[in-house]
């Protein structure tokens, strides 16, 4: 799932880039299609960004576990980050089906 999300994230960035180009807006149909595609991907990409933030927080907290002075804070942060990752992963599983057909 994460590999598919990375691919969709790249696609989303490409769409954003294309929509920033004035030539795209010269073709109203193309601009509308890209805008629709961006709107469909936006909720999934927002959830993916939250997941990545939680993942990075967990990674940072794991590094701090070896520091005796930071151990308690690191455990708490790690627990919160992992919980956030689990919640967001469930949200991603639910929402990814609306973007990627089950056969993929």
Ranges and model annotations:
Residues 1-104:
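Charged, heptad-repeat coiled-coil alpha-helices that serve as long linker/dimerization "arms"
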